[in-house]
């Protein structure tokens, strides 16, 4: 008789073990922003890239990569939340990774599977692929918590966001 393998995870994966403090630093660098929204997603992405403290060449490069990624598949998770990010982070000439937390006054249609328009975004830009995957995994893990859509809909301040992320990731 064959023994069944225990497939339950006993220890966190390498990505989950990534230090929450590194994500927090990236979120601090990116800041918390309130945008009008209500336009089409390309206009919103142009507005997002305009928030970056980089020259126009880098902003345009990020914009083009965001558009390519979004055309490939929507970055909307559902429940009005999205994580826009370029497909190829290592090609960007960034000084440091950052995550911009954004709340929209008017939602934008990002073609989410649940058909709900997006009102909150966590815009991820990474210097290298490994960190990109780690941050993306951590952000998605937090945003998939059942209480998060309601919490995010209240437009928390940055400290409240950090506390919520810390509770899930630490």
What are these regions, as identified by a protein language model?
Residues 1-170:
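Cytosolic covalent-transfer regions centered on His/Cys nucleophiles
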